[in-house]
Amino acid sequence: MPAVTNGRQTAALDDDVVVFLIGMRINRIRSLRSWLPAFRAMPRMLGELARDPELGFIHGQSFLSGRVILQVQYWRSFELLSAYARGHDHEHLPAWREFNRLVRDSGTVGIFHETYRVGPGTAESLYANMPAFGLGAAVGAVAVAGRGQSAGHRMNPGVADVPAVEPY
C-alpha cells in the first residue's frame, strides 16, 4: 500500500501534460464473448507502456463504478499519445481493430475516451494526507505552501491567496 504523505500538497505542474480518460461500459453483462477481448486488451497495453517510457505514458490509475471501467492516464504530450494509439508496432491498434470487428455495432460494450491538455495555470490540485494520487502521482507533488494555500491562487498567482478555511 502506498505511503501516506501528511499535510497538504499540490501537483508540481511545471510543464504541459495530457490527461487521458479511457474506458469501457459493459452494456450486456451476459455477452461475455463480445466484451471480454476489449477488457483483456488493456493490461497488455499498460504492460507495454510501463516497459517503454519513451512512448510517453507517465502514470495511470484504474477505477470501477458499476458497469464502467475507467483508466485515468497521464502522458507527456498529445503527439506521443496519438503516435501510440495509431502505431502499427504497438498493442493498441490491433486491439482497436479487433474491437471494431467484434462489437462496434452490437451495443454489447461501449468505449469512450476524453483528452485534456493541462499545464501551469490551467489546472490545480490538492492532496491532504494522501498517498501519491492522480496528477500529483504523475508529475510529482510539492507542499501547498510553495504554490499557494487557495485553489484560486494556484490557478492564477495574481489572485490573492486567501484560503476559505484555516489551512493545516
Residue ranges and their predicted role:
Residues 1-68, 80-83, 106-168:
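Short S/T/G/P-rich N-terminal loop/turn motif that feeds into the first structured element of a domain
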Residues 74-76:
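Tryptophan-centric aromatic hotspots in well-structured domains and transmembrane helices
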Residues 78-110:
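An amphipathic, aromatic/His-enriched active-site/gating alpha helix that lines ligand/cofactor pockets
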